[in-house]
């Protein structure tokens, strides 16, 4: 799963996770020579991004970084992206199986 594959803390936008996903399916769209070094960490641990859907807050990434990247894309890889896609597809499959198994009208 994501937690096991993604090494970076606060990997929010265009970092290790998203870049790995793109490398796996459209490697031609990633110019690895232009990937910036990690430049941003949240100043307060309470602000850290935890990928939990219960509570989200937003910001303009360009207010936080010069590049708009929040994460460390230098740790991205095609192989990691392939594993992330496989894990995501498996999660989606399980969710769909749950929906299919729900009988209607509800008992």
Task: List where the protein language model places each region.
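Extended, histidine- and acidic-residue-enriched regions that form the cofactor-binding/catalytic faces
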Residues: 1-107
């Amino acid at each position: 799963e994501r937690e096991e594959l993604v090494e970076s803390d606060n990997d929010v936008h265009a970092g290790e996770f998203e870049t790995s996903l793109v490398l796996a399916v459209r490697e031609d769209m990633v110019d690895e020579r232009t990937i910036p070094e990690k430049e941003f960490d949240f100043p307060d641990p309470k602000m850290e991004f935890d990928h939990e859907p219960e509570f989200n807050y937003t910001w303009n990434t360009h207010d936080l970084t010069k590049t708009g990247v929040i994460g460390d894309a230098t740790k991205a890889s095609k192989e990691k992206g392939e594993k992330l896609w496989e894990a995501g597809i498996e999660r989606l499959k399980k969710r769909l199986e749950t929906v299919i198994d729900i009988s209607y009208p509800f008992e």
